[in-house]
Design a protein with these regions (language model features):
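Conserved TIR/SEFIR loop-to-helix hotspot centered on a Trp-containing motif
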Residues: 30
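Nucleotide and nucleotide-moiety/phosphate-recognizing core
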Residues: 1-27, 36-52, 58-64, 71, ...
């Protein structure tokens, strides 16, 4: 595809954010996220917008990260992520219609 990277909006999980918290950025590094590393490799740049959705950190250091991120959330985490789905959709719509700066101001945090 011949889509400019700045027109690609990537949504990813983020263990460094509490479950349900959103963080939108216009560009940035992979921050240790393997999926973002792969996207950066294929796009050839870090200059693309991304929306990170907090999933929280695993309950203990020995917990397999892939199992944590791909697992089914429970309890309060599930409720927070359900609310985050709607907010993330709204943030994406805002980004597309009003621009990344407006979306960051409105939805980060």
């Amino acid at each position: 595809f011949k889509i400019p990277p700045e027109r690609v909006l990537v949504v990813s999980d983020e263990v460094a954010l509490v479950p349900g918290r959103l963080r939108m950025r216009a560009s940035g590094s992979a921050g240790g996220h393997n999926g973002l590393k792969n996207i950066i490799l294929h796009l050839g740049t870090e200059n693309f917008p991304r929306l990170r959705v907090g999933v929280g950190s695993p309950p203990h250091p020995d917990y397999d990260m892939a199992d944590w991120v791909m697992g089914v959330p429970r309890g309060e985490d599930a409720a927070a992520l359900e609310k985050a789905e709607e907010r993330a959709a709204d943030a994406i719509e805002c980004c597309v219609q009003q621009g990344i700066d407006r979306a960051m101001n409105r939805y980060n945090g």
